[in-house]
Amino acid sequence: MLLGQVVALVVLVLGTAALGVWWSARQGAVRAPRQAPAGIDWASAGIALADRVTFVQFSAEVCAACRSTSRVLGGLTGSSSGVGHRELLVDDHLDLVRSLGVLRTPTVLVVDGGGREVARMSGVVSDTQARQALNRVPTAAAEADGEGQS
């Protein structure tokens, strides 16, 4: 009886550890965009897009990961021309949240100058992950790399 309980406990611990590793690996990972609904009009939603690429961040008022992600994206957009960052509270944009399939905060959509979603990230985003997402938009990536090396 005791051996069975020990085996069950070991299986539970290993399963929990595997779940933790999987969860950590997904934090901020750059993924391909979901199939965006046709004809999203960002301007009518009150979102002014930057010339080349915009990080559209969906946040919640009480979200430490959102503040951290906002600092990372703000730093990147401040050093790159044509790159913008718009932070939206999910409570104020429920229609967009539903239509874009935003399931957690922070969720960051990488939107090109034409309004198309190029990449998507969920969870805390590092500077490296943000630059990786920026690389999905070739003209913005070249601009950011050139300015970062000056």
PLM segments and residue spans:
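Typically the conserved alpha-helix immediately C-terminal to a functionally engaged Cys/Sec
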Residues: R67-S79
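The canonical Cys-X-X-Cys-His
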Residues: C63-C66, V108
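N-terminal targeting signals for export/organelle localization
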Residues: M1-G39, S150
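Short active-site neighborhood of thiol/selenol oxidoreductases, capturing the structured segment around
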Residues: L49-E61
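Non-catalytic, surface beta->alpha helical segment in thiol-disulfide oxidoreductase systems
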Residues: V110-S150
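Structured extramembrane domains adjacent to transmembrane segments
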Residues: A65, G75, G84-L89
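Thioredoxin-like thiol-disulfide oxidoreductase module
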Residues: H85-R104, G114, D127-P138
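Membrane-cytosol interface motif
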Residues: R34-I47, V53
